[in-house]
Design a protein with these regions (language model features):
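Generic secretory/membrane-interface signal
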Residues: 11, 24-25, 294
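N-terminal secretory signal peptides that target proteins for export/translocation
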Residues: 1-12
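N-terminal maturation segment of proteins
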Residues: 28-442
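Bacterial N-terminal signal peptides
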Residues: 15-26
Length: 442
């Protein structure tokens, strides 16, 4: 407390007296035994976890989208807004105390994960304070990974393949738009197709993963978003899944979104963490999900890779041709060419990272970024602008989809060694007991 100048003199003599008394008793206290309860008591992981949750919730008061999900004590959310400087100090204290912990084998992974998550919180606070960082510095600090450097010549090779598959006049992105139009799901069939895709992905996931009996979701259709789909996890194994209908949705996106947002993607990931870590183990730090953190690389990477786990290529093609195409009222006569085109397009996925890095690092302007997305992502003008909006809002987060998928795939495939049942086992264990990118690469 800072006292007003007008009453300062009132306390002068008392302050001097207090100082003298403190000096008088210093010799008596120097060699006295410390209170073991308050001074030497070991800090527990659960105490540090509670501090971490409260810290991330407090940071969330400074950014509308930082807290993606929270289902811990409601009272912890209802705290006064604290200055960023104070939060940075709290975070640094937490990080220092984590470094003092000698984690047992049982809690070693828990300790490592919480430490890396805490480091990302510290970085995000500095970002909110206005500190400037490069794209790679941001992705490393927030997501524990750096996207590889890819030469544009690699993308050009994929474009040449697509040019052969889709011959004709005009820019390639326009030819792609014309070709893809015949595979767009009519708006009045969207709900039917999506629910069929979700039902199938749910059944396939349940064969290998023991989901909570009460797990469920609500499906909504929205507009005017920078994303194509979103899972809002509410706790108790319940999700609100939203699909953005701003742009036409092609038939292949039904399984993509059903699996990514639902099964075995985000909905399953959050449900398993809540079931095994929060409810069974009492590890409260997993009750909060800060969006801009290493957890998101696993979340997005596993949601993308999970599509292939649930739907191996030949099974996916069969289900789409036999079930989804008829439900959408689409002609499947050119489906083989469509899948060939999609396979080549997948080689272009890292263009998002290249464009985001150059744009956010100030190497290119918005117009150039749009042109690059139109050329290499084969986007329309409007779709390219939507993607730039996503990049502006979420910045280095874009690496989590492609790089995250590759890191998760490498981890799971290395341990499962091509065995389909083992793949499900390793994959589900990774969702239930999360690892950051560097932990997966150990």
């Amino acid at each position: 407390m800072i006292y007003p100048l007008s009453i300062r003199s009132f306390f002068c003599s008392r302050v001097i007296t207090a100082v003298l008394l403190a000096l008088l008793f210093t010799g008596c206290s120097e060699n006295s035994a410390p209170d073991t309860e308050t001074q030497n008591r070991e800090i527990t992981m659960n105490e540090l976890a509670e501090r971490y949750v409260k810290l991330t919730l407090a940071v969330g008061q400074h950014h509308d989208y930082y807290i993606d999900a929270y289902y811990g004590p409601e009272a912890w959310r209802e705290q006064d807004k604290q200055p960023l400087g104070e939060l940075l100090q709290l975070g640094e204290n937490l990080h220092a105390d984590l470094a003092k912990i000698d984690a047992t084998n049982h809690e070693k992974s828990r300790h490592e994960f919480l430490t890396i998550q805490t480091e990302s919180v510290l970085f995000f606070i500095k970002h909110l304070q206005g500190e400037q960082f490069s794209f790679d510095e941001e992705s490393k600090a927030l997501y524990d990974a750096i996207s590889p450097t890819i030469d544009e010549s690699e993308f050009d090779q994929a474009l040449a393949e697509l040019d052969d598959l889709l011959p004709g006049d005009g820019p390639l992105n326009q030819r792609m738009a014309v070709f893809s139009k015949q595979f767009e799901i009519p708006k009045d069939k969207l709900d039917t197709v999506f629910r069929a895709a979700i039902k199938e992905s749910r059944q396939r996931t349940r064969q290998f993963i023991d989901l909570p009996t009460q797990e469920n979701f609500t499906l909504e259709y929205v507009t005017d978003k920078v994303w194509s789909g979103y899972n809002w996890y509410k706790g108790n194994s319940f999700s609100l899944i939203q699909m953005n209908t701003d742009f036409p949705i092609t038939i292949d996106r039904a399984i993509d979104l059903a699996s990514h947002e639902g099964y075995p993607g985000h909905h399953v990931f959050n449900s398993l963490m809540e079931k095994h870590l929060v409810n069974a183990n009492g590890w409260i730090e997993y009750s909060v999900y800060p969006l801009f953190s290493p957890m998101s690389l696993l979340a997005e990477g596993s949601a993308n890779y999970g599509i292939d786990v649930a739907f191996p290529e030949h099974e996916r093609i069969a289900f789409e041709k036999e079930v989804l195409f008829p439900l959408a009222g689409l002609d499947s006569s050119k489906v083989d060419l469509y899948y060939a085109v999609q396979a080549v397009r997948s080689k272009l996925s890292y263009i998002d990272n290249v464009v985001a890095k150059r744009y956010l690092d100030g190497q290119i302007d918005k117009q150039t970024a749009q042109q690059m997305l139109m050329k290499y992502a084969l986007s329309s003008e409007q779709k390219a602008l939507q993607r730039i909006g996503f990049i502006e809002q979420n910045r280095a987060y874009v690496i989590n989809y492609n790089l995250g998928q590759d890191i998760v795939r490498d981890y799971v495939e290395q341990l499962s060694k091509g065995n389909a049942e083992k793949r499900w086992q390793v994959f589900s264990e990774l969702l239930a007991y999360p690892k950051t990118a560097s932990m997966m690469r150990h």
